[in-house]
Amino acid sequence: MDFIRAIILGVIEGITEWLPISSTGHLIIADEFIRLNQSAAFKEMFDVVIQLGAILSVVVLYFHKLNPFNKLNPADKQKTPREIQLTWRLWLKVLIAALPAAIIGLPLNDWLDKHFYHFVPVAFMLIIYGVAFIVIERRWVPNHEFSVMNIDRLPYRAALYIGLFQVLSLLPGTSRSGATIVGALLVGVSREVAAEFTFFLGIPVMFGASFIKILHFFKNGNSLSFEQFGVLLVACIVAFGVSMVAIKFLTDYVKKHDFTFFGKYRIVLGIILLIYAMFRAFLG
């Protein structure tokens, strides 16, 4: 039965990790109805592994763009010295943007999860950022031209600014992609570049967070049975495959549409969560 639950949760992670609708919010809902019959430590490891599956999809999809080493590229896809230089610059921008989350997130992440990983805080963050998306798209964007239409032209200062917005995503329900896309739009980055940079920014942030949590899991004397390993592997593969589709969908979607739909979706989901939380509290 856990294998079926793992597949469902992998699908949810694969879709919601990259769309700006909060993977945490959806996983909280899923956990209410699709609980894994496992320990709390394993569930935390499970969340880490499905995130790894999601981020590996970015590495695979954008390997050539992100790879500065020609030795790892096919003969027909060798980069010019200029392209290699731009790739290194892109990585520098990604690392600059990742710094605020690393500095602030490491000491606060567990505390924030403990105090805010609940229905009501998540619901409010869903609604707040849903409203933000709608306001930015309807009020801000029409009065400001996009100044960054190519990721190679993204200024280092803008990368840092986007990274500061990513810190806000430490609050469950915010959405890492949602926070960074909002920050990118406010500094004049086009929707396409905002989405793409968000994908890349997830690599050091999510790999780093996953490494720390995996280390913490085994350091505390936990181990995995053969069945548990199988559950993790299945969920990781599903999250990887679904993420590939979700990333392709979002990159195509933002070429013709804005983020208003996602804002409305977040608001509706947030309201549903609040109603459910009140209903559950009423029933005791």
UniProtKB/Swiss-Prot annotation:
EC number annotated for this UniProt entry: 3.6.1.27
Main EC class the enzyme belongs to: hydrolase
One matching Pfam family: BacA
Membrane topology: Multi-pass membrane protein
Further comment found in the protein's record: Bacitracin is thought to be involved in the inhibition of peptidoglycan synthesis by sequestering undecaprenyl diphosphate, thereby reducing the pool of lipid carrier available.
Biological role: Catalyzes the dephosphorylation of undecaprenyl diphosphate (UPP). Confers resistance to bacitracin.
Similarity field: Belongs to the UppP family.
NCBIfam families documented for this protein: PRK00281.1-2 (NF001389), PRK00281.1-4 (NF001390), PRK00281.1-5 (NF001391), undec_PP_bacA (TIGR00753)
Protein name: Undecaprenyl-diphosphatase
Lineage: Bacteria, Bacillati, Bacillota, Bacilli, Lactobacillales
Gene for this chain: uppP
